[in-house]
Amino acid sequence: MILLSFVSDSNVGTGEKKVTEAWISEDENSHRTTSDRLTVMELPSPESEEVHEPRLGELLGNPEGQSLGSSPSQDRGCKQVTVTHWKIQTGETAQVCTKSGRNHILNSDLLLLQRELIEGEANPCDICGKTFTFNSDLVRHRISHAGEKPYTCDQCGKGFGQSSHLMEHQRIHTGERLYVCNVCGKDFIHYSGLIEHQRVHSGEKPFKCAQCGKAFCHSSDLIRHQRVHTRERPFECKECGKGFSQSSLLIRHQRIHTGERPYECNECGKSFIRSSSLIRHYQIHTEVKQYECKECGKAFRHRSDLIEHQRIHTGERPFECNECGKAFIRSSKLIQHQRIHTGERPYVCNECGKRFSQTSNFTQHQRIHTGEKLYECNECGKAFFLSSYLIRHQKIHTGERVYECKECGKAFLQKAHLTEHQKIHSGDRPFECKDCGKAFIQSSKLLLHQIIHTGEKPYVCSYCGKGFIQRSNFLQHQKIHTEEKLYECSQYGRDFNSTTNVKNNQRVHQEGLSLSKAPIHLGERSVDKGEHTGNL
């Protein structure tokens, strides 16, 4: 094995030598042209019986004080061994820097280090006060304050303050992943990514919360967790002002306003805002219901649904409103309820600007603009926006009236109609007119009444321009122009254009009134036959 080193004559008179650089060559033509003399020394191979480890003085010259001459032909086929490498192997130290305390094998390395060091133990940044030992580190740090990014990526044009950061970034384009986990084989672009990943295997959690003691693998996870204690919500929605502790939660929330649903079911095409909702939806197609209630036998696809269902049997309502004390089985129902107190309506229709507190109401409302009617009656083919409307409609065909009044026995198709009817017995009239004090059982009746005070007649006949307060009167009036007569007298077969006129006709037969004295109803007014004197 042959060791090559370049030695320069620093003082010709004394013969003093100094190592300035060391390198290896496989080809004599690759040697630099230099004034330095080449010192060649034969070293014993590791296989030889007598192994001699020379001192640094022996590497720089002849042990007996005589210079070893050499010719260029002697270094053919030399191995890659340098003075620096040799000193690392033997552990011998040549020089110690008085400023940094570092050991250096070559005097040239020591000189380079001393040029880097600035006078004084710490060299602070004049902007932020951070201290650095080396001038090059301070220069790189100052670039970060200036915002200067002199290193630009050729692929995408992104700029960086340090060349090392550019080199790391370029691995994204090349796909190079130098750092490999020796446990699972996963590779990473950045060394920091490998270090963080290895904590998964080691179980190390160095980042601990000072408030509750919970520990985390990553500092970013700790920062997010601390917002639970501080209630900080730095990510704010520009549409509604709602704040979030994580940027990912803000991005997901913004889909409510944009209507974006990136997760689509391959089976039926239904799309979702969250990936978790899509995963839950997929089980509808597989029809797997593995969680069964022991009380009633009802089965569920998700364990969480079973737990919620069991609260019906136990009566447990763990989610309580702080404002009014009302309790709920589900947390989602509590969140919806709390919007009554806060007045929050986060779901905004892009078509008309109407706001909603619940996603279900918002989705249903959008069908008004799209004209989509998903729920169709099998009996008559009539379609509806809501499933509840279809269920209510189907009772017309079945004749089912499940809501019966306990006072009078009258039955109704809808629970809302029963509730309104019961106010007749209780005398409850919760809807009062602010102008005259008149009270009504139904809110719709109050709205109709208030039009009397405003004088508004929203229903205008397109034939004659006459206005009406109530839609029912407007529809009856239009039948005069269309000559539509839907109601027939059961005794004489006479046709009428309203149920009111049919009832009046029946009263004529029952009371034995002459047709000449029976009133004729025209629209909203009734005229006696005796008054037909040409004033009409």
Curated annotation (Swiss-Prot):
Ubl conjugation as a keyword of this entry, yes or no, is yes
List keywords of the entry alphabetically.
DNA-binding, Isopeptide bond, Metal-binding, Nucleus, Repeat, Transcription, Transcription regulation, Ubl conjugation, Zinc, Zinc-finger
Q: Which GO terms describe its molecular function?
A: DNA-binding transcription factor activity, RNA polymerase II-specific; RNA polymerase II cis-regulatory region sequence-specific DNA binding; zinc ion binding
- What are the GO cellular component annotations? nucleus
Q: Where in the cell is it found?
A: Nucleus
Q: Where is this region: Disordered?
A: 57-77, 513-536
Grouped into one coarse class, the protein's main location is nucleus
Q: Which residues cross the membrane?
A: none
PROSITE patterns hit by this protein:
ZINC_FINGER_C2H2_1, ZINC_FINGER_C2H2_2
Its family? Answer: Belongs to the krueppel C2H2-type zinc-finger protein family.
Protein name stated in the entry: Zinc finger protein 623
Q: Which gene encodes it?
A: ZNF623
